[in-house]
A protein has these predicted regions:
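Function-determining surface determinants
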Residues: 1-238
């Protein structure tokens, strides 16, 4: 499943680049976002299950859970992964992206490149700082949005890292990373909770797991809030 995971990460990174920097070229096809999203979903969530098996299950075992096993995976996708990647739509998308990368650009970015980068990064930075002000009061969807913003910002910084002094950039990422990790852990717990809620009617022992997850979510949420508070005070490098 590692190659599938890496493909999904690559798609996430590309979607972030197109979303934030896509206006730099008139050759960017606006349909690519939707096509990449479709392909991402078709690749399924096997990696989510692997991550839970490696991280959550040992914790449950250590906590003395009477039942330590992930629920069976739902039939979420009737299209095999290799078939999805070999489909005409996927091949056309890959060819279009390759053509975009290798063809000479008609658009020559003007001298205000760093100014434009700063504007884009500042927008994401401010959105995350605004969320940090009241993160614990946000609903689940808004907290999920914060997680995606943090991840998108990190990807964007990695894309333009060579243009900025290393020390300031590293310090910024150092304060961003803990927030990303705690938000990722919170998301994993939400995924696990949804999995086990479907099973609890058939297996009463699962109540222990749901109780443990609920308690862990409270702890991770407070940790995420603390990490976001620290991040909100960090100096920007742009």
């Amino acid at each position: 499943s590692e190659h599938v995971h890496q493909t999904r990460v690559a798609i996430r990174r590309l979607r972030s680049a197109l979303r934030v920097f896509g206006d730099w070229s008139t050759d960017v096809d606006p349909d690519w976002q939707e096509q990449l999203t479709t392909l991402f979903r078709e690749l399924g969530s096997t990696r989510d299950r692997d991550a839970l098996s490696e991280g959550l299950l040992p914790q449950l075992q250590q906590a003395g859970a009477p039942f330590v096993q992930l629920p069976d995976a739902p039939e979420e996708n009737s299209i095999p992964i290799e078939e999805s990647l070999r489909s005409l739509d996927s091949i056309n998308l890959i060819l279009a992206l390759l053509q975009f990368v290798h063809q000479p650009s008609k658009d020559q970015k003007k001298s205000g490149l760093k100014k434009d980068i700063a504007k884009k990064l500042q927008k994401l930075h401010q959105q995350i700082c605004k969320d940090a002000d009241h993160f614990l009061e946000l609903d689940i969807e808004s907290q999920h949005r914060t997680r995606k913003r943090v991840k998108r910002l990190r990807y964007c910084i990695e894309f333009i890292a060579s243009l900025y002094p290393g020390k300031e950039l590293k310090n910024y990422l150092k304060d961003l990373k803990p927030a990303q990790e705690s938000l990722g852990q919170f998301n994993d717990l939400n995924v696990a909770e949804a999995m086990f809620q479907d099973l609890v009617k058939r297996k009463q022992k699962v109540w222990f797991i749901l109780g443990w997850i609920a308690n862990e979510k409270k702890y991770i949420l407070e940790q995420a809030q603390a990490h976001l508070d620290t991040y909100a005070k960090t100096d920007t490098f742009w």
